[in-house]
Amino acid sequence: MTENIHKHRILILDFGSQYTQLVARRVRELGVYCELWAWDVTEAQIREFNPSGIILSGGPESTTEQDSPRAPDYVFQAGVPVLGVCYGMQTMAMQLGGKVQGSTQREFGYAQVEVLTDSLLVRDIQDDIGTGGAPLLDVWMSHGDKVTAIPADFVTVASTETCHFAIMANEEKRFYGVQFHPEVTHTRQGQRMLERFVLDICRCTPLWTPAKIIEDAVARIREQVGNDRVILGLSGGVDSSVTAMLLHRAIGERLTCVFVDNGLLRLNEASQVMEMFGDHYGLNIIAVPAEDRFLSALAGIDDPETKRKTIGRVFVEVFDEQALSLSDVKWLAQGTIYPDVIESAASATGKAHVIKSHHNVGGLPKEMKMGLVEPLKELFKDEVRKIGLELGLPYDMLYRHPFPGPGLGVRVLGEVKKEYCDLLRRADAIFIEELYKADLYNKVSQAFTVFLPVRSVGVMGDGRKYDWVVSLRAVETIDFMTAHWAHLPYDFLGRVSNRIINEIDGISRVVYDISGKPPATIEWE
């Protein structure tokens, strides 16, 4: 019998902050399971979840507006600790009898908080000591409204020069509010505060560890599928690879993986996937060579969205044919991860995250009555990688830069042709190889090469050449929502350019993309 790793759990109510998923990841990093729900949950749902504590997230709304989101009243009646963050603190204050008002002075960015009153939330946690001997905390603020009167039975724990109620607390009920964001790294002691709340105040035991998550997932897979067979579309990406390894550990040869070589992969990627998972790990894999089929379907198409849809449609067709040929398979496995679940959750209020369609497999034929196995659906990407390491997958594979689902189909601008893909594959391989050799690969968040469907004059020896152009792209980012172009050394860029032009017949010019996001996107299409 496996240990119940969900026994201690934190409920995070989402009021729309861009940082809400970060709160959940920080709680998970403490070894405690948590779930992220829209703010408009019912009392019955909270009771059923049975949280050890509740966190109210930040959000863009103003609590001074009549129709702005509110926490369910039951949150404050459940008898568990509650932590309100930014907007979460404001709605807590207002709902419990305090006052909030709009401020003419927004507080955004770094602030120093002075601790005035002892509180378990921040006891012995400080960045510095003020002139009067009071502990000081370096925090990250992002708010317009602020609490102007705290509820009865609360005390002011900390203040800034412009925000008198920076931390408030009702120690008896274990209710706490912080006007800043402890989940961001700019709040230097933020993780210690979250640790204090989750482990000490909520009394959670850290059970959410990679080894225990694997043990739990294996047990659940075995219970779900019994002695049945399972099919999985294996791409070689992080999510499908970790899903494959979990399923293989749980059911062994009763897993069949389908690897579709669409001709839009990186250099030698198809052979590497087959060698790693087939030869090395001993998984049962069907390799489907489908380059001609994909390229034929893409012929004459230059619109990026149409290309994406075409690639998705053909993949579904190819995968379905393989699935139908395996008559005894009763389960379909997918590498759905927790952010997919969050983003796909429609909320009647419209406050939930943007709805996103899954691109894992798409719609299977109606005649196929298959159950769905999603062993990663509770996990964030960083957790999936840690589990992959625990399962024995190589670090370089798990922490490789992101690669788009449509592959080179959206890195060849305009119409996709085999000639263009072959040139791009080789150019990209040189760029990545040089990044590794210069110890730069792990210092940038994403790097790749783009094929431009324009010809440029070049000189090779005594001759003139008129060949294609590629663009190098490297960015630095924390969350991929915004990004800066990477300031790679000139001599490095020169070396990459020389190698590409000299070693690849068909490319005459190399450029470097120095666009940030915004206004540009990271991928060109």
From Swiss-Prot:
EC numbers: 6.3.5.2
Gene3D superfamilies linked: 3.30.300.10, 3.40.50.880, HUPs
Pathway: Purine metabolism; GMP biosynthesis; GMP from XMP (L-Gln route): step 1/1
InterPro entries: Class_I_gatase-like, GATASE, GMP_synth_C, GMP_synth_GATase, GMP_synthase, GMPS_ATP_PPase_dom, NAD/GMP_synthase, Rossmann-like_a/b/a_fold
GO molecular function: ATP binding; GMP synthase activity
Residues at the active site: C86, H181, E183
GO cellular component terms given for this protein: cytosol
Nucleotide-binding is among the record's keywords: yes
Top-level division of the source organism's lineage: Bacteria
Quaternary structure note: Homodimer.
Job description of the protein: Catalyzes the synthesis of GMP from XMP.
Name of this chain's protein: GMP synthase [glutamine-hydrolyzing]
Designated gene of the protein: guaA
